[in-house]
């Protein structure tokens, strides 16, 4: 996942990759190889960052890959395909530690205090992808509202059901896509158990 959102050696170490006995050079090569094998994702990072910076810098609206960016009343809004918007408070364009442009905004930091935060291409894409995933899960929750849904965790839904209920029917229902996600290939898996556990 670290590679998918623009992470490099530091992100891989934070996820425990150095515990596998790999050197920094080997980790860097893994990142380089992943990026070469995934050019569309890498391009998405740069397209998203460019449009976000353009929206903030020009106090205007931009769009790429079906994602809309706008600067309104001191906020950067990123509109997802569902129409829901992510908001970044008081965005500014500032120089980052690499000498390039980054968006900073007010938010809650790791110390749980309000502070200035910096974002970057991969982090913006991570927020967008997680937002879309949330919207898809919410759509599934609505389409399965006739079921006794006892909880949901990230991309999982917990349903308490009669044994006669078909797991396949639930998975087929969860794999349905909303009109705003036309063309998305979505599949759902599931399992049955007496009490909740990780698959």
Predicted regions located by residue number:
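Conserved catalytic core of nucleotide polymerization and phosphodiester-bond processing enzymes
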Residues: 1-199
């Amino acid at each position: 996942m670290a590679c998918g959102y623009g992470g490099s050696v530091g992100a891989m170490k934070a996820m425990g990759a150095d515990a596998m006995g790999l050197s920094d050079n080997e980790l860097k090569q893994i990142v380089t190889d992943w990026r070469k094998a995934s050019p569309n994702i890498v391009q998405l990072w740069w397209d998203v960052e460019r449009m976000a910076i353009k929206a903030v810098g020009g106090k205007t609206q931009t769009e790429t890959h079906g994602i809309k960016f706008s600067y309104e009343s001191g906020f950067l809004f990123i509109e997802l395909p569902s129409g829901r918007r992510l908001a970044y408070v008081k965005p500014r364009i500032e120089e980052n530690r690499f000498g390039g442009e980054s968006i900073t905004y007010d938010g809650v930091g790791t110390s749980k205090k309000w502070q200035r935060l910096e974002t970057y291409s991969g982090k913006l894409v991570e927020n967008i992808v997680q937002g879309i995933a949330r919207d898809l899960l919410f759509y599934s929750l609505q389409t399965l509202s006739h079921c006794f849904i006892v909880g949901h965790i990230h991309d999982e839904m917990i349903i308490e059901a009669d044994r006669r209920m078909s797991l396949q029917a639930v998975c087929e229902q969860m794999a349905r896509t909303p009109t705003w996600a036309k063309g998305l290939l979505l599949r759902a898996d599931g399992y049955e158990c007496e009490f909740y556990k990780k698959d």
